[in-house]
Curated annotation (Swiss-Prot):
Source species: Emiliania huxleyi
PANTHER family linked: 50S RIBOSOMAL PROTEIN L36 2 (PTHR47781), LARGE RIBOSOMAL SUBUNIT PROTEIN BL36B (PTHR47781:SF1)
Listed name of the protein: Large ribosomal subunit protein bL36c
Keywords noted in UniProt: Chloroplast, Plastid, Ribonucleoprotein, Ribosomal protein
GO annotation terms (biological process): translation
Family: Belongs to the bacterial ribosomal protein bL36 family.
One cellular component term from this protein's GO annotations in UniProt: ribonucleoprotein complex
Predominant cellular place of this UniProt entry's protein: plastid
Localization, UniProt: Plastid, Chloroplast
Recorded GO MF terms: structural constituent of ribosome
Name of the gene: rpl36
Length: 48
């Protein structure tokens, strides 16, 4: 899975791609071609 700063242009890669929001992050998933998986948003730092 790749991490990108913007998935706006990547939405149109395939007709099966869909944008999903999970736990504050935005994911682009594709059932027909799993190589196209993308995540937007970086990991948050945990407080000690």
């Amino acid at each position: 899975m790749k991490v990108v700063s913007s998935i706006g242009s990547l939405k149109k890669r395939s007709k099966d791609c869909q944008v999903v929001k999970r736990r504050g992050r935005i994911y682009l998933i594709c059932k027909s071609d799993p190589r196209l998986k993308v995540r937007q948003g970086r990991a948050k730092m945990k407080r000690k």
